[in-house]
């Protein structure tokens, strides 16, 4: 099988010739640039500056030589711009605090404050506001909360203005975007045999990475995360109006995207909203069913009616109690499958595969990234990876990836042990 054939078999719940692997096809299956740099060195690959494909999380580009070294089966059709609001071109050097040499898009503008924190300007515009901060010694960015005071929750809901507050956050794609997607999708589809993940984005309803308005130069309304979650109970019509607007824009963008890429992609990235904590849900099931599920169903239904793509849905945490609702809303591929949160509440890999293996393609869950991968021994990594692959890869419906992105400071030996266990062969 080619990589593309292998992934197509897996996402259609057919047994592939061996377990498919994803390293870096999107912003939830990647690797911090510092770790990419060290892994390349450990594998004897060229040492060079790495482009940051996703600068918010500081994810390093997974180039062809590394894709081949670990036998990864997917590549991402990324957007021309990034979630920091500037284009992925005009690359300029940017060294991480640990010395890792990277390139970042030319629109990146930042200052260093008195504490040594890197303060990033919104959309590269020094006349606007700081939107992101990387603490001194850090390896990724955090959003900046621009509202010092809690939102006044004593207001009448009819006095709120959700459409005005959020009009700058959701934008219909441009003709230039469409031309880029068409050209890049043709290059990836015709020039490689990798499966292709369309990293469109835009349907992360209530995603904590976007609620503060990092790409809005003058964010308004309910933006502090604690206020936003409280508003689900106090102002549900406000939340629903925001989601209605976001969904309407997403459906327009999906139409543009389909015209641009056709059937050259196999999976489309839909949402990265986290609904789970380490111990349970952020909200009740009824709240999810009322405010979120109808919108996700509308988006997933459009994809299934109009394309042959599978939909990719990311949610960290213990989401055991949402699995049935996610299935009913049309989710195909579930990521990152955080067993470190799900298993203590009764959802083991075996039970998940038995009860939901015919419904979802599980995309991740290959090794615990909170404890085993960063702090375990290579033998402990091998043991857990072997068990997860044995259970989850039965009958297809599985793409190997750790639980979420691999962060900085993970030992290279553990990463090599991880990939060698999946492949059943040495990679160096």
Predicted segments, located by residue:
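Active-site loop segments of alpha/beta catalytic cores
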Residues: 1-41, 45-53, 62, 138-428
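Short, surface-exposed beta-strand/loop "edge" segments at domain boundaries and coil↔beta transitions
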Residues: 28-31, 85-86, 126-132, 205-206
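Short, charge-rich binding segments
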Residues: 65-69, 101-102, 111, 187-191
């Amino acid at each position: 099988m080619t990589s593309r054939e292998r992934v197509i078999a897996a996402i259609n719940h057919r047994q592939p010739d061996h377990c498919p692997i994803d390293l870096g096809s999107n912003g939830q299956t990647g690797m911090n640039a510092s770790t990419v740099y060290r892994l390349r060195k450990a594998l004897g690959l060229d040492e060079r500056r790495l482009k940051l494909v996703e600068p918010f999380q500081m994810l390093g580009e997974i180039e062809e030589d590394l894709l081949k070294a670990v036998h990864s089966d997917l590549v991402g059709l990324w957007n021309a711009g990034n979630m920091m609001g500037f284009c992925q071109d005009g690359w300029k050097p940017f060294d991480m605090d640990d010395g890792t040499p990277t390139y970042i898009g030319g629109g990146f503008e930042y200052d260093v404050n008195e504490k040594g924190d890197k303060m990033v300007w919104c959309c590269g515009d020094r006349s606007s506001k700081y939107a992101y901060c990387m603490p001194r010694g850090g390896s990724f960015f955090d959003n900046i909360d621009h509202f010092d005071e809690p939102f006044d929750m004593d207001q009448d809901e009819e006095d709120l203005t959700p459409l005005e507050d959020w009009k700058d956050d959701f934008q219909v794609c441009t003709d230039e975007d469409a031309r880029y997607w068409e050209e890049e999708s043709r290059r990836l589809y015709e020039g490689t045999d990798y499966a292709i993940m369309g990293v469109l984005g835009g349907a992360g309803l209530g995603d904590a990475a976007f609620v503060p308005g990092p790409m809005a130069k003058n964010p308004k309304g309910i933006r502090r995360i604690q206020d936003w979650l409280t508003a689900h109970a106090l102002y549900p019509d406000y939340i629903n109006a925001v989601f209605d607007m976001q969904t309407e824009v997403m459906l327009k963008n999906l139409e543009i995207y389909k015209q641009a890429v056709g059937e050259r992609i196999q999976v489309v990235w839909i949402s990265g909203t986290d609904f789970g904590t380490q111990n349970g849900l952020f909200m009740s099931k009824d709240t999810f069913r009322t405010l979120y599920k109808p919108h996700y169903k509308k988006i997933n239904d459009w994809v299934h009616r109009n394309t042959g793509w599978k939909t990719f849905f990311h949610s960290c945490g213990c989401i055991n109690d949402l699995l049935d609702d996610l299935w009913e809303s049309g989710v195909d591929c579930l990521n990152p499958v955080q067993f470190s949160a799900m298993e203590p509440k009764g959802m083991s890999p075996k039970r998940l595969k038995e009860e939901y293996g015919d419904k979802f393609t599980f995309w991740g869950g290959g090794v615990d990234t909170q404890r085993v991968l960063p702090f375990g021994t290579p033998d402990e990594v091998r043991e857990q990876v072997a068990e997860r692959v044995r259970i989850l890869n039965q009958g297809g419906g599985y793409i190997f990836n750790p639980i979420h992105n691999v962060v900085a400071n993970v030992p290279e030996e553990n990463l090599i042990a991880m990939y060698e266990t999946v492949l059943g062969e040495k990679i160096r």
